[in-house]
Amino acid sequence: MIWHIQNENFILDSTRIFMKAFHLLLFDGSFIFPECILIFGLILLLMIDSTSDQKDIPWLYFISSTSLVMSITALLFRWREEPMISFSGNFQTNNFNEIFQFLILLCSTLCIPLSVEYIECTEMAITEFLLFVLTATLGGMFLCGANDLITIFVAPECFSLCSYLLSGYTKKDVRSNEATTKYLLMGGASSSILVHGFSWLYGSSGGEIELQEIVNGLINTQMYNSPGISIALIFITVGIGFKLSPAPSHQWTPDVYEGSPTPVVAFLSVTSKVAASASATRIFDIPFYFSSNEWHLLLEILAILSMILGNLIAITQTSMKRMLAYSSIGQIGYVIIGIIVGDSNGGYASMITYMLFYISMNLGTFACIVSFGLRTGTDNIRDYAGLYTKDPFLALSLALCLLSLGGLPPLAGFFGKLHLFWCGWQAGLYFLVSIGLLTSVVSIYYYLKIIKLLMTGRNQEITPHVRNYIRSPLRSNNSIELSMIVCVIASTIPGISMNPIIAIAQDTLF
């Protein structure tokens, strides 16, 4: 009898939960329409893979790319709409969140054509790769719009789980297995640290989980200046730091970059930073509103360590991917300057603008590395010597992307850094901006060192890898070079295009 009553209660509770979920999806589904497009694309991929043969492989790429482009289109049509909070306060839709979602979708859209030839040559499983990329993109998009602690924890876990699987996709590669193990262990540790920080916020605010309600709860409980908030700030900064990979939370980055498949590294190097930056701005700016001095100091320390260590250690690297790993650590230091400045002096606008340029510069560089690696099988910087004599197009493309990463005028990276540093200078971050300028000069040194190798024509310096280099005969049909051309053009945009980009970015306020 008791079992029967308990069974009936379980059925009633399950029905209520299902009806509530259906009600939320029915009335709030329009607020996540771009995400729904990706979910539909995921389902379609699974259906086609389970019912088709190898001849339908082009359809898998087409569906993935189309769903991403349609999701971007849906975001653009929703631009400038009034900010809305949906799903019982769990998700927020506004211009600020949507521009970060756009950046993530743009990264994924460029990464798929970059991966096609690599997947074919290495005989990787295609469907699973595309599923993981789309699911990680979905997790990143939900993280950008997350408005409560639970969603902020679950969304990056969705992204991280796919990242672990992608980094270990080449199971027979010992370096890939080692990288995945380190990535998984450190990712699990950082997630536990992050949720511990959330628990301090939850308790201090009187049991609130929504970001704005946490602020109100801290005021009501008079806990906004308590030691518990400082503890929460430290734990949350460490947890988010793993996603952003600033120093000293960067230990996993070089190994994962070196051991993972190159298209996976290209995808992770930008999407993880974009999603984590969007989440960091909201977490630091809203729940820690009363602790702005403390988190400014913490981020300044992280930025200084990242810019100095990242760029100095990059000089000593012999692997191209490890060099870019340490370079990315330095780049995130520049991005943190924009987070510290905030809205007051256009910090968020400068950060968004620089991240847009960083996407094109970084993906363009990785497209060149993928193309060179498939034809030579090497990743050593010395093996790039004399590439200009065999493939001038690839050498010039790589040189332009590296120069843009270094911030040389008149390339896009120069104007992105200039605007970012100027906003920091106006906000009074003189020491931080000075460190940024000095480390940018250091980065130009090791980028120019690689470019000098590319352009050398002396036979004694040209390695056998370049002597035996086979140039691609059909450029128009090469998807890697399609991504490369798009990224190189975007990386060399002159300063005349800065004003409209900054104007759009300045509209992305909370």
Swiss-Prot record:
Transmembrane residue ranges: 24-44, 57-77, 99-119, 124-144, 149-169, 183-203, 227-247, 295-315, 323-343, 354-374, 395-415, 418-438, 484-504
For this record, the Gene Ontology CC terms, alphabetical, are:
chloroplast thylakoid membrane
Gene Ontology terms, MF aspect: NADH dehydrogenase (ubiquinone) activity; quinone binding
Q: Which GO terms describe its biological process?
A: ATP synthesis coupled electron transport; photosynthesis, light reaction
Tell me the compartments it is located in.
Answer: Plastid, Chloroplast thylakoid membrane
* EC annotation from Swiss-Prot or TrEMBL: 7.1.1.-
Membrane topology, record value: Multi-pass membrane protein
Q: Fetch the Pfam families from UniProt.
A: Ndh2_N, Proton_antipo_M
| Residues in coiled coil | none
Domain of life the protein comes from: Eukaryota
> Per UniProt, which keywords does this protein have?
Chloroplast, Membrane, NAD, NADP, Plastid, Plastoquinone, Quinone, Thylakoid, Translocase, Transmembrane, Transmembrane helix, Transport
Hey, what's the signal peptide range on this chain? none
Q: Which reaction does it catalyse?
A: a plastoquinone + NADH + (n+1) H(+)(in) = a plastoquinol + NAD(+) + n H(+)(out); a plastoquinone + NADPH + (n+1) H(+)(in) = a plastoquinol + NADP(+) + n H(+)(out)
* Known role: NDH shuttles electrons from NAD(P)H:plastoquinone, via FMN and iron-sulfur (Fe-S) centers, to quinones in the photosynthetic chain and possibly in a chloroplast respiratory chain. The immediate electron acceptor for the enzyme in this species is believed to be plastoquinone. Couples the redox reaction to proton translocation, and thus conserves the redox energy in a proton gradient.
**What protein family does this chain belong to?**
Belongs to the complex I subunit 2 family.
- Subunit comment: NDH is composed of at least 16 different subunits, 5 of which are encoded in the nucleus.
Q: By what name is this protein known? A: NAD(P)H-quinone oxidoreductase subunit 2 A, chloroplastic
The organism named in the record is Vitis vinifera (Grape)
Q: What is the lineage of its organism?
A: Eukaryota, Viridiplantae, Streptophyta, Embryophyta, Tracheophyta
